[in-house]
Amino acid sequence: MQRVTITLDDDLLETLDSLSQRRGYNNRSEAIRDILRSALAQEATQQHGTQGFAVLSYVYEHEKRDLASRIVSTQHHHHDLSVATLHVHINHDDCLEIAVLKGDMSDVQHFADDVIAQRGVRHGHLQCLPKED
């Protein structure tokens, strides 16, 4: 491990210290390493041909104009990416789905975009993890 020096403006340093404290880091270096790893992983997922895993989560109203069947159709269209799906009934109207995906990150992103863009889907979020060698 090597030691490096960086210069941060006061506001950014205060934000880093606040984040470090909230997340329970022992020091700034640990926080900065995790932030950098996250940024590098995100960058890697944007490169064409990158293989990896992802978690897609979203909420939708199951009774809304064939939305559930459209989502299932989209999932079947991209069946090669799906590892598992968890379906949770939040209340009488809303469902939460969490899909674990595996494959080319550009295909995963395309699938996520297709699901999240469906009218009636809310709180869509894709978390990508590039495959580590």
From Swiss-Prot:
InterPro entries with a match to the protein in the record: Acetolactate_synth/TF_NikR_C, ACT-like_dom_sf, Arc_rbn_hlx_hlx, CopG, CopG/NikR_regulator, Ni_resp_reg_NikR, Nickel_NikR_proteobac, Ribbon_hlx_hlx
Name of the gene: nikR
Co-factor requirement: Ni(2+)
The name this protein goes by in its record: Nickel-responsive regulator
Record GO terms (molecular function): DNA-binding transcription factor activity; nickel cation binding; sequence-specific DNA binding
Family: Belongs to the transcriptional regulatory CopG/NikR family.
Binding residue positions for Ni(2+): 76, 87, 89, 95
Species annotation: Escherichia coli O127:H6 (strain E2348/69 / EPEC)
Protein purpose: Transcriptional repressor of the nikABCDE operon. Is active in the presence of excessive concentrations of intracellular nickel.
UniProt GO BP: response to nickel cation
Keyword DNA-binding: yes
Keyword Transcription (UniProt): yes
Assembly and binders: Homotetramer.
